[in-house]
Structures are given as C-alpha cells and as structure tokens.
C-alpha cells in the first residue's frame, strides 16, 4: 500500500498514541502532526480546533473542507504536493467564519546559535529570543503578522499557549520543544499586539499550572497575573546623556541620590506624570541621581517591589513600558541619573510565576537547604545553572540597555554570598570545599558585574551588603565581586545610634562617629539613609532626634550635613529631605502638608537643596571619595565637647574644612587648626535662620592666623552653634 493510499478515510488521523498526547496537551512536537505534510503525491492538512464546527483550507481560489476526525482534530488530503501557501477558515458555533494563517505551517523562530548560547548561559540579549515577540513573515498569499512565543521548561510534559485569543483554552495552541534545549516555541498569526497570554504547563510532577511568561515585557495590573504582548516604538531624546555616560566613572564624580517609592511619593501619578513632577522636584532639590525601589512587576504591593514575578516587565501600576521609558528619558534630559533596585537573590512562591515552573525546581536550587529563603518565605535562584544565570545576567543588561538605566542597586547580596545566611545549625549545605561561601553566587555576581560594565560603560552597580566580605568593590580580574560601590551599613548604624542619643551622653559614644574612618577607603561606599530606616517601628530620621522640635530640627540638619561631608556617596529616602514626622507606609503618600504648616520642614528642605548645590560645586566633597588623599582629621578626639572636625580635599587641589558640634550648647572661642592663614568663607552653617535655625554663627567667615593648632600651621577661632555643622573654604 502506498503512502497516498494510507492517507485516506480513517488514515488521515495520526497514530492513536500521538493523538492521545495531542489531546492531553503533552505532545512535544504538535507541528509534526498539525499543519501541512506531504506524502508522495498527496498533501495532508490537519488542524486541531476543539469547539469549531467547520474548518476549511483555502488554497488559492479553491476550498477544501477538513473532516472532523475526533476530539477537535480536522484533516483533509489534497491530491497534490508542493503546496505553496494556504489559509484556514474556521467557524465556531454562533460566530462568523474567520480566516487565519495556520500557526503550524511556520518554521521555528529560534536559531541553533541562540539555543546554544542559552544552554551555555552566555546569551547577552536573551530577551530578544525568549518571551513574546511580534513578527511578520512574507508568504505567497501575503504578509502574515503575529507573535512568536518561546519559554524554557525542559522537564515539562507539554506546554500550550493560552490567552484571550482562544478563550484561555489549553488545547488549541500546543507548543513544540526545540530539541534538547528545553525551549518550547510557537508562532501564532494574528495574535493581538497587546493581547494577554499565559503558558499552560503540564509539569513533570503531573500538576497542570497556568504560568506567566518569565520574559514578559508587560503584564496585567495586579492583582491580575497574565502577561501582555508588548513592543516598543519609543523614540529616545537622551542621546547626549547616553554619550556622556559612556565616558564617565561614577566613583570619581558627584553622586547624591534621592530614593523613591513611585507609588507613594505622590499617589495616583502615572509614569508620564512622574516624568514631569518628580523630575522637576529632583532638579529643584539638586540631587544628581534618583534610585527607584524595584519597578519590575510584583503582585504584592506590600513587598515594595522586592518580591518580583516578572523580571522583564516594569510594573503596569503606573503605565506601559514606553511610559516608563518616558520617565527615564525626562530624568536624563534634566541631567538626573537613574538607578533601580534589582532583586536577583530570591523570588516569591506564587504558583503562576517562576517557582517549580515545569513541575521541578527549575529557577530555584533543588536542595531546599539552598533553594529556599526561610526569613522571607521565598525561593533562591540556582546560580550554578547556566540557563538561570543567563536569565539574571541578561535581565541586568535588559534594564541597562532597553530602558537606559544608569545603575543597579543589588538587593540582599549578603543572603546570596553565604550558604548559612539566616539558617540554623544543620539547616544549610556546605560548598565543595566545606565552607559557607556560595561559590556559584560569587561567580554569578562577578559575571553580572563584568558583563554589565563591558556592555554599558559608565553605569554603576551597588551592593546592599552588610558583612565584612572582602573585595565587594574590587575588580573581578583581581578576585573581587566587581561592584562599583556598596552600601556602608556600619556607618549608617553607628551614626544613627549616636545622633539618637541625648547630647548629654554623646561624649561617651564618640567612637561611634569616628570608627567609620578606620575602614572608609577599604571599599567604594554609599552612605545610605534609606527606606529601611523609616519603617517597621523605627520611626523617621526626625523622630530619632532627641529634644523638642527646635532641637530635633537642628539634629536632623546636622546629621544631613555630616552625611554629605563624610567620604562616600549619599542616599536619602524620600520625605526625609523635609523631615517627615510619620513613619513611611507604601499605602499612603508623603506628608507634603508639613511644608505648609511649619518652618522646620521648609528649613530642612532648603538645607538639602543648598547642600546639594554646594556639594556639586566642590570637588573636595566627591572627587577623592575612595582614597585617603581625600580626607584628614583635624581633631577626631574632642569627645568632651562632642565636636568632630576634618578636612576634605579635591583632585583639583580644592579644600573644605568641616566642623560638627553635636553638643546641645554652642561653643564660643573654639580654635580650629587649618592648613593656611587668611580668610575662610563659611559656605554652610546649618544653624542659619534661612534653615529655621537660631542664627548663631561667624558672620559668613573667619580669619585664620599663623598660629599652629591641631598639628596644622594655621588656626581660626570660631563660634560653633549648638547641634550644627559648619563648612569652610578659603576665600
């Protein structure tokens, strides 16, 4: 019997086992059954359309009705080969016929090189391969537009595309797996350009789940969880900024950062509204950068963005991805750098997201002692798996390239570095050398940092890392992790402990303000007064200050001046720049009304504005932040008076003398050693009346004489206002 004879009548159907897998949604190659297949002098077209009442193949001007065989499978044998093109006309009960190209007529949209690079973990533009991508193909019957879908699920028994386009039916759009790659793929013609979709995954554990696309560029607004097909037609206007970025080294430049939670800065604003209002505010306040709490999509607003489910999608709460691009663009055109918080340490266990994606531990480590973060109830990425490492490294590059982000602040680095992080004895598995270091996480961080700085020169990567791990900001080629900077958590804790004490007791804790200089140049530091310090019952910076409102305001002003004068870059969480009194909550906006009700808030806000202006104009405050040449003590030991004083030096030869009186009383006739005689101008006095202070000071400057003091050749006699900071420069 010839092949053509077999393909008649009941022989149009595939083998029963093949048919059973197709109906069950567990066929690994539905394209091998569906679509057009040539057999000697016949061509068979099969279409799997459950719930359809009629399917017709349109070949040129000819119509061929497909026979319904079983369970929604339709087929017809055409009496010729070399079929060039065709369309399917599908009719559902109660609906008009609609004509579409056959999805199972198209070749794979991924190439062997892409799959090879992914398997090795080295595809630097992986987001262009996996996920959902609108495409067009030219065929004999015209251009076919649609969307190609690709998802990695190597252990799945089957994967189908579901969405609004098919009524979330898991049968009509089964996907094929591309060899040993574990990538399932399908091109679907006429898919809506902003259509919602998920993947129905038949897991290796026998459980069927509907999953959001790990590479989705867009999502439904939470709490809805579907992915959305998204493409960009945004035209950037920040060419000058991007060209300049490639030439910069942020470590040696001014960097004062305003940390923002977009949803509660001013509730109700979209990305494009923020592009106007937030940009104007940051420019007015003089910050050089803004750092956004995680903007990647997250279902639970109470996580502040730190439990991410869609790593490639800006949250849809405030608009589209192009709307987010507009926000970044506006900030760049105003001269503001943009940093985003990035969370590669862990991810939530939501059943529709990454966890046990194909019925096995896929993105997470298979050993529960390594694959779960007990404190947060989340999964930990398997940093040693090439495809997972590629998912994360490519994600970092995606934000830097596709959204022009200037920096990534990597969250919870300590939890990545240590296998025993927050684990009880016996609750962790040592590395191959018997140690507690997570060697795979170390290698991942090194690869991420090296690749990010190679692909996007001039960007900054910042580690939130609170342990003594050595070499966090050391280059990877000499064994470091390769971060540009790390948060100085020790400085933050010591400083806040000190300033929260009554001035009467501060002299006994003077070391808390001097200890940071013992290690200030061991890494490249950011000095954070972040969101973590104004939540969970910690109050606010204002609330930590002792005394009445006048004393609290003076304390906060002196703290901020100390932060900006200390070696390191600055980060300040929103609301603290005007002394917000209520603890922050993501559920409500900042207390902007304080600026209308009391002068203290206005004074603090103006101080921050002036400090930023002075900071940018004085390289002594930033150009040698990471070297001992940029700093020297004038007097570190005046604990009796609660006074600290030091010099800052710039790479241009500039100098700045900084004096801090943390006592509750003023000091008159306070002699300060200086490097040269002559007039020294008071560029900052935090007790000035313009900041709602008491107005005690030095009438704008002092005259230094050739009287040695503090081991220096000259000195000047100053008045130090209570709880204040003075900055002086040669006139």
From Swiss-Prot:
Is inhibited by divalent cations such as Zn(2+) and Cu(2+), but not by Mg(2+), Mn(2+) and Ca(2+). Is not inhibited by several known inhibitors of the GH13 family such as ADP, ADP glucose, tunicamycin, castenospermine, nojirimycin, or acarbose. Optimum pH is 7.0. Its EC number is 2.4.1.18. Disulfide bonds join 193-617. It comes from the Bacteria. GO terms for biological process: capsule polysaccharide biosynthetic process; glucan biosynthetic process; glycogen biosynthetic process. Pathway: Glycan biosynthesis; glycogen biosynthesis; Capsule biogenesis; capsule polysaccharide biosynthesis. GO terms for molecular function: 1,4-alpha-glucan branching enzyme activity; cation binding; hydrolase activity, hydrolyzing O-glycosyl compounds. Optimum temperature is 30 degrees Celsius. Loses 20% of its maximum activity at 37 degrees Celsius and is nearly inactive above 55 degrees Celsius. Keywords: Capsule biogenesis/degradation, Carbohydrate metabolism, Disulfide bond, Glycogen biosynthesis, Glycogen metabolism, Glycosyltransferase, Transferase. One of its GO terms (cellular component) is plasma membrane. It catalyses: Transfers a segment of a (1->4)-alpha-D-glucan chain to a primary hydroxy group in a similar glucan chain. HAMAP family: GlgB. PANTHER family: 1,4-ALPHA-GLUCAN-BRANCHING ENZYME. Monomer. Interacts with WhiB1 via an intermolecular disulfide bond. Essential enzyme that catalyzes the formation of the alpha-1,6-glucosidic linkages in glucan chains by scission of a 1,4-alpha-linked oligosaccharide from growing alpha-1,4-glucan chains and the subsequent attachment of the oligosaccharide to the alpha-1,6 position. Is involved in the biosynthesis of both glycogen and capsular alpha-D-glucan. Cysteine residues of GlgB form structural disulfide bond(s), which allow the protein to exist in two different redox-dependent conformational states. Although the conformational change do not affect the branching enzyme activity, the change in surface hydrophobicity could influence the interaction or dissociation of different cellular proteins with GlgB in response to different physiological states. Belongs to the glycosyl hydrolase 13 family. GlgB subfamily. This is 1,4-alpha-glucan branching enzyme GlgB. It comes from Mycobacterium tuberculosis (strain ATCC 25618 / H37Rv).
């Amino acid at each position: 019997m010839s092949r053509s004879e077999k393909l008649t009548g009941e022989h149009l159907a595939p083998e029963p086992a093949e048919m059973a897998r197709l109906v069950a949604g567990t066929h690994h190659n539905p394209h091998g059954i569906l679509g057009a297949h040539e057999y000697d002098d016949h061509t068979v077209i099969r279409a799997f359309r459950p719930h359809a009442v009629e399917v017709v193949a349109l070949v040129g001007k000819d119509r061929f009705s497909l026979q319904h065989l079983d369970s929604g499978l339709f087929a017809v044998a055409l009496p010729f080969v070399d079929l060039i093109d065709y369309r399917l006309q599908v009719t559902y009960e109660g609906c008009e016929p609609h004509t579409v190209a056959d999805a199972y007529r198209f070749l794979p949209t991924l190439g062997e090189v892409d799959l090879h690079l992914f398997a090795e973990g080295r595809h630097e533009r992986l987001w262009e391969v996996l996920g959902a991508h609108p495409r067009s193909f030219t065929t004999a019957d015209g251009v076919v537009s649609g969307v190609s879908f690709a998802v990695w699920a190597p252990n799945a028994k089957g994967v189908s595309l579901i969405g609004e386009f098919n009524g979330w039916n898991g049968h009509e759009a089964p996907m094929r797996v591309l060899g040993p790659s574990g990538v399932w793929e399908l091109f679907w013609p006429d898919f809506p350009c902003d259509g919602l979709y998920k993947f129905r995954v038949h897991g290796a554990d026998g459980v069927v789940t509907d999953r959001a696309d790990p590479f989705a560029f867009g999502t439904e607004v939470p709490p809805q969880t579907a992915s959305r097909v998204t493409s960009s037609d945004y035209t950037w206007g920040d060419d000058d900024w991007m060209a300049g970025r490639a030439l910069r080294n942020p470590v040696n430049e001014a960097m004062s950062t305003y940390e923002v939670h977009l949803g509660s800065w001013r509730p109700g604003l979209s990305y494009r509204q923020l592009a106007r209002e937030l940009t104007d505010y940051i420019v007015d306040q003089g910050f050089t950068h803004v750092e956004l709490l995680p903007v990647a999509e997250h279902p639970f607003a109470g996580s502040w963005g730190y439990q991410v489910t869609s790593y490639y999608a800006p949250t849809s709460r405030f608009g589209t991805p192009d709307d987010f691009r507009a926000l970044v663009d506006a900030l760049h055109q105003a001269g503001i750098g943009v940093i985003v918080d990035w969370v590669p340490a862990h991810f939530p266990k939501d059943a529709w997201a990454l966890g046990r994606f194909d019925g096995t531990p896929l993105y997470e480590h298979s050993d529960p002692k390594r694959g779960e973060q007990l404190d947060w109830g989340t999964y930990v990425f398997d940093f040693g798996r090439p495809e997972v490492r590629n998912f994360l490294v490519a994600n970092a590059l995606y934000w830097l390239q596709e959204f022009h982000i200037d920096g990534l602040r990597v969250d919870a680095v300590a939890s990545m570095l240590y296998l025993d992080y927050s684990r009880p004895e016996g609750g962790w598995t040592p590395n191959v050398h018997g140690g507690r270091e997570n060697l795979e996480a170390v290698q991942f961080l090194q690869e991420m940092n090296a690749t990010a700085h190679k692909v996007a020169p001039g960007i900054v990567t910042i580690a939130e890392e609170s342990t003594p791990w050595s070499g966090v900001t050391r280059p990877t080629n000499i064994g470091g992790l390769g971060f540009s900077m790390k948060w100085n958590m020790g400085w933050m804790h010591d400083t806040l402990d000190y300033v929260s004490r009554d001035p009467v007791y501060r002299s006994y804790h003077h070391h808390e303000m001097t200890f940071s200089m013992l290690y200030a140049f061991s890494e490249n530091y950011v000095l954070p007064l972040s969101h973590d310090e104004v939540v969970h019952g910690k109050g606010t910076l204002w609330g930590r200050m002792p005394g009445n409102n006048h004393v609290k305001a003076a304390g906060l002003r002196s703290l901020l001046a100390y932060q900006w004068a200390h070696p390191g870059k600055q980060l300040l969480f929103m609301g603290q720049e005007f002394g917000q009194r209520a603890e922050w909550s993501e559920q409500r906006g900042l207390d902007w009304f304080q600026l209308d009700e009391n002068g203290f808030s206005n004074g603090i806000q103006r101080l921050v504005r002036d400090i930023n202006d002075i900071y940018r104009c004085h390289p002594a405050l930033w150009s040698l932040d990471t070297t001992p040449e940029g700093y020297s003590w004038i007097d570190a030991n005046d604990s009796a008076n609660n006074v600290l004083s030091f010099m800052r030096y710039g790479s241009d030869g500039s100098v700045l003398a900084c004096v801090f009186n943390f006592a509750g009383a003023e000091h008159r006739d306070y002699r300060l050693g200086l490097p040269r005689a002559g007039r020294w101008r008071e560029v900052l006095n935090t007790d000035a009346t313009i900041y709602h202070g008491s107005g005690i000071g030095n009438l704008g400057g002092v005259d230094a004489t050739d009287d040695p003091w503090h081991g220096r050749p000259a000195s000047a006699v100053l008045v130090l206002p209570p709880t204040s900071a003075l900055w002086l420069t040669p006139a």
